[in-house]
Curated annotation (Swiss-Prot):
<feature type="binding site">
    <location>
        <position position="219"/>
    </location>
    <ligand>
        <name>S-adenosyl-L-methionine</name>
    </ligand>
</feature>
<keyword id="KW-0949">S-adenosyl-L-methionine</keyword>
<dbReference type="Pfam" id="PF05958">
    <property type="entry name" value="tRNA_U5-meth_tr"/>
</dbReference>
<feature type="binding site">
    <location>
        <position position="235"/>
    </location>
    <ligand>
        <name>S-adenosyl-L-methionine</name>
    </ligand>
</feature>
<dbReference type="InterPro" id="IPR030390">
    <property type="entry name" value="MeTrfase_TrmA_AS"/>
</dbReference>
<keyword id="KW-0819">tRNA processing</keyword>
<comment type="function">
    <text>Dual-specificity methyltransferase that catalyzes the formation of 5-methyluridine at position 54 (m5U54) in all tRNAs, and that of position 341 (m5U341) in tmRNA (transfer-mRNA).</text>
</comment>
<dbReference type="GO" id="GO:0030488">
    <property type="term" value="P:tRNA methylation"/>
</dbReference>
<keyword id="KW-0489">Methyltransferase</keyword>
<keyword id="KW-0808">Transferase</keyword>
<dbReference type="InterPro" id="IPR029063">
    <property type="entry name" value="SAM-dependent_MTases_sf"/>
</dbReference>
<dbReference type="InterPro" id="IPR011869">
    <property type="entry name" value="TrmA_MeTrfase"/>
</dbReference>
<dbReference type="InterPro" id="IPR030391">
    <property type="entry name" value="MeTrfase_TrmA_CS"/>
</dbReference>
<dbReference type="GO" id="GO:0019843">
    <property type="term" value="F:rRNA binding"/>
</dbReference>
<feature type="binding site">
    <location>
        <position position="214"/>
    </location>
    <ligand>
        <name>S-adenosyl-L-methionine</name>
    </ligand>
</feature>
<protein>
    <recommendedName>
        <fullName>tRNA/tmRNA (uracil-C(5))-methyltransferase</fullName>
        <ecNumber>2.1.1.-</ecNumber>
        <ecNumber>2.1.1.35</ecNumber>
    </recommendedName>
</protein>
<feature type="active site" description="Proton acceptor">
    <location>
        <position position="354"/>
    </location>
</feature>
Amino acid sequence: MPLPTYDPADYPTQLATKVAHFEQNFAPFGVANTAIHASAPLHYRMRAEFRIWHEGDDLNYAMFDPADPKQPITLETFPPAAESICHLMPRLRDKLRGNESLRRRLFQADFLATLSGEMLVTLIYHRQLDEAWEAAAREMAAELGIGLIGRSRGQKIVLDRDWVLEGFELNGRQLRYKQVEGSFTQPNGGVNRQMLGWACQQAAGFGGNLVELYCGNGNFTIALSPLFERVLATEVSKSSVHAAQYNLAANQVENVALVRMSSEEFSNALAGREEFQRLKDIDLEPFRHATLFVDPPRSGLDAVTLELARGFDRILYISCNQETLRENVIALQDTHEIKASAVFDQFPYTHHLECGLLLTRR
């Protein structure tokens, strides 16, 4: 993980620069009055990964300056990370320093925190882990009150569970999300809540049915589900589908049909070009002119999915790459126009800016 530069005094200026770039990028499509959702200037990251730098019997967390990638910068703490991570870092380091089984050939430490107060740490080694490691790791995890996983090549030791349970309030509902180690989760918990709130605000009053592609662990699915009669959500990752199934049950959501398939497969199914056993119990007809929600990878929507999107009256689009978002808007501009826009600063002090658009049929 490269070392970011961060100065809370500079944050408003940096955010304003990113917002100006977005508005300039989308001005030709009539974007105006963009809703701006800022991050906390510090303690915003719910995930953090650090190399472990050894000097004799000592060790420290380390990151690297991209301008000098061979020279480690050792850290006592990391202010962009959640306060719970910052509080844990020195305590965990001291435990690791004091135990040869835990320290030997330790390469990396990954932290996964939640707004609800849970913590999971993954320790990655350049050696096989043995019973002595497991005994020491169990004792340390109990003393620190954390979940712990040990990894090495071809080996994964989970001491309790390989996930955390996130929980927060949104629009009067208490939402819970299973977040699995190694799977994608939103890195900025505070901004994620703002994204969910904006999406719900835009969808309020739509009614009818919702199709969601790339649903992940159900982050948006669960937040949006009360606003629609029925939801059909798709996701290709097996671990994300399992997490989404857990999350739907944990939040008592009963109007969602979740199918493991790619956006291209679903597009072909809805167009009648292919039939899939996974969809045999789902009537697709009510979803043909529903609302479409997409939160695609950085590559944006492919040509097949864009063709699918043209058939929907409303498209809610969350993007982590405004360049591919712009390309997709150009491809859709003959059928859809932008009605609302928002930016979400998931990654302060970087050039990245999460974007949200509501597009409606012309």
